[in-house]
Regions:
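The catalytic Nudix box helix
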Residues: 41-76
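N-terminal strand-loop-strand
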Residues: 1-40, 53
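Nudix hydrolase/Nudix homology domain
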Residues: 32, 37, 105-153
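A generic structural micro-feature
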Residues: 3-7, 35-38, 89-95, 116-121
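Residues that scaffold the ATP/ADP-binding catalytic core of kinase and kinase-like folds
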Residues: 25, 49, 132-135
Length: 153
């Protein structure tokens, strides 16, 4: 769980299929701090002493069941630094690094999910980037939805 004032580095993987659709997870994140539900790519926090690339591979395995070697990921395609303001007046900052991986499709395996993920992930689906942008749904990090339209359209 993110603490008030904490800086959180995350590693994520932009999974897309040959049709250009993106696999996203809808999460409540942490209802206790009042952040709205939003769509995210698979990923999560970088552990102390862990590289961003290794964290992306670990998180992808935990959240989807996809097993990769770290060198199967190319260079990061999106990087965002920002701040989430909480409804109670607190906030936390973040730095997201997103890698890209094309997949033909897969059956998600949630057996690696933490208790928080089972509580917080509402659903998951493939999105057409333009439909995601035009849906009005919240997408994190800031600017990702616009990037997806430019990058995958």
């Amino acid at each position: 769980m993110v603490q008030p004032g904490q800086h959180r580095a995350t590693a994520r993987v932009l999974l897309h299929n040959p049709q250009g659709e993106v696999f996203m997870l809808l999460t409540h994140f942490d209802p206790e701090v009042g952040l709205p539900p939003r769509w995210l790519t698979p990923g999560g926090g970088v552990d102390e002493g862990e590289s961003v690339r290794d964290a992306a591979v670990r998180e992808l395995r935990e959240e989807t069941g996809i097993v990769l070697n770290p060198d199967q990921l190319g260079e990061p395609v999106f990087h965002a630094i920002g701040r989430w303001d909480w409804t109670d007046g607190n906030h936390h900052t973040y730095e997201d690094t997103i890698f890209q991986l094309q997949v033909e499709g897969f059956e998600i395996d949630t057996s690696g999910w933490t208790a928080d993920e089972h509580r917080d992930v509402v659903r998951y689906r493939w999105w057409n980037p333009t439909e995601l942008l035009e849906s009005g749904e919240a997408v994190a990090p800031h600017g990702l939805a616009e990037f997806l339209v430019r990058h995958l359209a």
